[in-house]
């Protein structure tokens, strides 16, 4: 369950790219502190961070360090270890769940989920490997 956080609290963002930058910029304008984890010193969201952790996204200890500095944690993309997130979400306040992450990491599951909610999608087929494809 997500708890309400008020300005002055810290939002942790895994990923310092364009989406992280937009979130950090808006949050700073509202009075929040920002902690960012990204492997690049040159990530575009770094300029808005109060705390910056340079680390790969699969570095469990560094991701947990970000969590310890944060009142709520989010991620800007789906290239994160869902199993690691599953462990961390039991202890820390994540906006997205590991289950949501697992769905967004696989386009077929993503489309199936959208259709289960009656959200229109383009037609698609499920292909597991090259034996599922006929080439003339």
Across the structure, where does each feature detected by a protein language model lie?
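ATP-binding N-terminal substructure of ATP-dependent carboxylate-amine bond-forming enzymes
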Residues: 1-105, 109
